[in-house]
Amino acid sequence: MGFFSFIQEIAMDLGTANTIIISDDKIVVDQPSVVALDRRTDKMIAVGEEAKMMYEKTHDSIRTIRPLRDGVIADFTACEQMMRGLIKMVHTGSRLFSPSLRMVIGVPSGSTEVELRAVRDSAEHADGRDVYLIFEPMAAAIGIGIDVEAPEGNMIVDIGGGSTEIAVISLGGIVSNNSIRTAGDDLTEDIQEYMSRQHNVKVSERMAERIKIHVGSALTELGEDAPEDYIVHGPNRITALPMEVPVCYQEVAHCLDKTIAKIENAVLSALENTPPELYADIVKNGIWLSGGGALLRGLDKRLQDKINIPFHIAEDPLHSVARGAGIALKNVDRFSFLMR
């Protein structure tokens, strides 16, 4: 991008937990989807990692917001501010003019027209000139390297922070899909609730997230892959005295069981609605897992045992949607039928 570049192309995975931006085939932004605003003026104080450091720690003058819930925009103004702040991180170096932005943004396949309009409006208010939307499972499939135009069935399960997107793809279209608002955030809430009920310790959302990363599991038996216990510090729910509680992966697996079962049922439901020929392709090719949820220990094995079809974790599950959106953006003419 030189001095006279007036159009900049960016691909964005606008996620409930994290927002990823790709420009010139490189990940240039990978930040938490959090913004801190001045309560009086609504002026942005911080965005991304800096705002997340403030999350659950602010005083009355500052509010920290996660503008997306369940994969869709919950706070339009905050989302616009956050997008603007994150896009500014892309604009490095000195330019005489701010470039016009050509954007492709990944959106949940179960989004309503109103929800799609909200994403488009936020992007346009954040200086997007040409804004295209692509459904997340389709973007994930492209990012994984699947030939989405082939006359062959492939299934993607994209587990994000706010929603799980399940789609059967063939001939450049989504044949059957199931978008449920059960995902990574629900696993975090399960851990918070479990720690409070079982150990009488209050843990923040961020601490529950750390527990999920360190000892989160979908299976109660991980064998050699078992992580060490994680020590949790927090106040006693009743006495407010400090506590130190070791947590093992087996108990976390038990507390996540119901939420994971919902994801299993959603996958089975999508398979039920899949035509037999495509179903045979999926059994042969296996099912692809992407999104942050794909990193939960043992999830692929649990799903495989339950559904009796091989599951593969994408090579870079956290960035599959963003990479796919980036490829679609570079080949807009070829993939125009996938854009909205």
Residue ranges and their predicted role:
Residues 1-159, 167-287, 294-340:
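Nucleotide/phosphate-binding catalytic cleft detector across ATP-hydrolyzing
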